């Protein structure tokens, strides 16, 4: 709604494959979600295809929403960034499919973490409940309660062109230097 009010395009959203369950998977997909596996290891075809999809998103200048931590924090605490999708975005930028990539960090916080009870059970050793239709039905009671406020904060945008000023060109970096760059960009996004 906020995007609509400000004449901004709704982004496509990178979502975990665990959210592709009936019936919400279809709803999420129609709302712009695309689903990705948690790991690309030992699957070069999937990795290559996914990277091509990310390059297409960049080339078409479609806003892309992703969670730098790889998932929502159910504890409410900041988690370490995951750099897989970030690295694909930067590789697409470096290949020239787009002039610049601009990251807009968004903080979403809550007075109450709804998953607190299940998170505590997991910390005590219980297995994590798998997302699915049954968990959605059981969660219906959650919608009846008031949990306080939701806070949304947009941080200063981070332009990759600006970020790279004074740094060696991406194309001249070796694998270790690129990994350090991914770390630096990830830290700049979350700080």
Features from the language model and the residues they span:
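Membrane-interfacial terminal anchoring regions of lipid-handling membrane enzymes
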Residues: 1-191
